[in-house]
């Protein structure tokens, strides 16, 4: 078996390379390449490990013909075109926990630096001045910290602030009341936070919803003299508006570790009193660099070797422990999706994926992704579990997941139903021995079949002699039957045949089969 090939294109702790090799990957460390130089070699690799220097653009992704996964050693993925990667079927991962403590500590450090004006006091003292009265600070004890974003890093900042006897008010649309109580913070809307906070710290990703969340308008709503810290992403604060707010005294101080444009060689904020800047140092500790390197290597190798998906940004996470359990279900789901995609006629409007029995106890997202991957092959031959949901969304397909804990005739069941302009079509399958996918129902007719290779699907009137005539036709044309599976509604009614054949059935043979007495539908299938 060929080993997966991984490229490390940014400076990274040597432990990353060591882990890749220990886990069965071939790895090259090639740093400092221009985008054009990187484009010349990226097509050789299955995996790519980067930090913030490499920019994985749409153009570069187009040249990554074999790339299956990219891992960002760190949290921010501004340097990766995730939509382009998703359409290409490339999994995008980050390592959100490796530098969480480091970043949280940097935010707390900047808060203290603002409270006591430490950088300016240091510069003044080293200039031979002794300006004790000029640098009067404030205590943080008893003050209110406004937390914009209460995820992993935000929750660590909250914990440290509570240890300093501060009050913490948090704004986060995903923060539940129960989680707020658990964290010991007050959940609030943004306007309430702006009005109450003595210090504001941001810990949220940059999205269309959060861009300029501290806009000119919102800065005007803050408590007079508020101090603001941003160790999250540039673009969360309107920097020109922040400059004006500092000049007017509405904002008493600001400390930014991140900027709208980086490297920040120029900014309207530079030179402003009560402003502190650091060059994106949030993750810059020895411990964090080792942690993110280890984590990105573990995550990428798990995916390339075992199929485990951890901290993916464009597909459901799937641990290396879950992967072996889900793999047969995903194989079943993909074949069911492929079957219904090949047989359904008309425009697809909706798809329902139902899991029953043992399947209902598993993570449904990989099963859904596999169904869509099989289904969407009618549109694209490069589809996989990563890009299938995006392709489905592009086409306006309504995707629904339904879980039934009950156990029916089969201990586990996956059912796929599509609604088209010509009616609903449904297929269902199970696992034999928990590992072997089997079709057990097609369009309401019970049938047991293994979906594999080249197959022939026939709907006919159930009548004596038909099977013999069909066998003769195939034999005369050199088509060898591997397996033969039959289902019917009632004796003498409609019957369904699924035959596996050793080679693809030519179009002229399909046309001859269509002319056999009693035949309603003939369709060649491929899995």
Specify the residue positions occupied by each region the protein language model found.
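An N-terminal-biased, well-structured beta-alpha scaffold segment characteristic
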Residues: 1-93, 215-217
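Rossmann-like dinucleotide/phosphate-binding beta-alpha-beta segment
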Residues: 14, 133-224
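Short beta->alpha connector loops at strand-helix junctions that form conserved
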Residues: 30-31, 51, 73-74, 89-101, ...
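Phosphate-binding beta-alpha-beta segment of Rossmann-like dinucleotide-binding domains, i.e.
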Residues: 88, 96-144, 148, 156-159, ...
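Rossmann-like dinucleotide-binding domain for NAD(H)/NADP(H)
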Residues: 88, 92-93, 216, 225-343, ...
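Oxidoreductase and adenylate-handling cofactor-binding alpha/beta cores
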Residues: 104-123, 143, 159-166, 294-307, ...
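A conserved regulatory-domain signal marking ACT and ACT-like small-molecule sensing domains
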Residues: 317-319, 324-360, 364-527
């Amino acid at each position: 078996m060929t080993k997966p090939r991984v490229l490390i294109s940014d400076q990274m702790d040597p432990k990353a390379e060591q882990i890749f090799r220990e886990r069965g990957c071939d790895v090259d460390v090639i740093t400092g390449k221009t985008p054009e130089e990187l484009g010349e070699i990226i097509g050789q690799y299955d995996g790519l490990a980067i930090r913030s220097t490499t920019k994985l653009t749409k153009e570069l992704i187009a040249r990554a013909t074999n790339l299956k996964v990219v891992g960002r050693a760190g949290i921010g993925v501004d340097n990766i075109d995730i939509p382009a990667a998703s359409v290409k079927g490339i999994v995008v991962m980050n390592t959100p926990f490796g530098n969480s403590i480091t970043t949280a500590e940097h935010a707390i450090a900047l808060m203290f630096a603002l409270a006591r004006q430490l950088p300016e006091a240091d510069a003044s003292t080293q200039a031979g001045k002794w300006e004790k009265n000029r640098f009067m600070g404030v205590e943080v004890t008893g003050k209110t910290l406004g937390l914009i974003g209460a995820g992993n890093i935000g929750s660590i900042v909250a914990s440290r602030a509570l240890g300093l006897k501060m009050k913490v008010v948090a704004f986060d649309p995903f923060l539940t009341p129960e989680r707020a109580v658990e964290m010991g913070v007050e959940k609030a809307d943004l306007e309430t936070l702006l009005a109450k906070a003595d210090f504001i710290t941001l810990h949220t990703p940059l999205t269309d919803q959060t861009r300029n969340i501290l806009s000119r308008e919102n800065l005007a709503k803050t408590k007079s003299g508020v101090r603001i810290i941003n160790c999250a992403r540039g673009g969360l604060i309107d920097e020109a508006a922040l400059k004006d707010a500092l000049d007017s005294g509405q904002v008493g101080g600001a400390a930014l570790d991140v900027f709208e444009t980086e490297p920040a060689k120029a900014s309207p904020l530079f030179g402003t009193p009560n402003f502190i800047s650091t060059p994106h140092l949030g993750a810059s500790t020895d411990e964090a660099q080792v942690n993110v390197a280890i984590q990105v290597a573990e995550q990428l190798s798990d995916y390339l070797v075992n199929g485990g998906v951890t901290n993916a940004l464009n597909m459901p996470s799937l641990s290396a422990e879950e992967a072996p359990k889900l793999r047969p279900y995903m194989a079943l789901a993909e074949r069911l999706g492929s079957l219904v995609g090949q047989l359904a006629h008309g425009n697809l409007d909706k798809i329902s994926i139902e899991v029953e029995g043992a399947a209902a106890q598993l993570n449904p997202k990989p099963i859904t992704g596999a169904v869509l991957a099989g289904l969407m092959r009618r549109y694209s031959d490069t589809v996989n579990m990563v890009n299938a949901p995006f392709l489905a969304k592009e086409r306006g397909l309504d995707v629904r997941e339904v879980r039934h804990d009950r156990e029916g005739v089969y201990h586990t069941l996956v059912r796929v139903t599509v609604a088209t302009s010509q009616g609903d079509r449904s297929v269902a399958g199970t696992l034999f021995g928990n590992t072997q996918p089997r079709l057990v129902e097609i369009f309401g007719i019970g049938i047991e079949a293994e979906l594999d290779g080249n197959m022939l699907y026939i709907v006919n009137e159930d009548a004596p002699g038909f099977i013999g005539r069909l066998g003769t036709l195939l034999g005369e044309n050199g088509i060898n039957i591997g397996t033969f599976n039959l289902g019917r509604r009632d004796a003498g009614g409609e019957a369904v045949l699924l035959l596996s054949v050793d080679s693809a059935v030519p179009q002229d043979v399909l046309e001859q089969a269509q002319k056999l007495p009693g035949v309603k539908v003939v369709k060649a299938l491929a899995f």
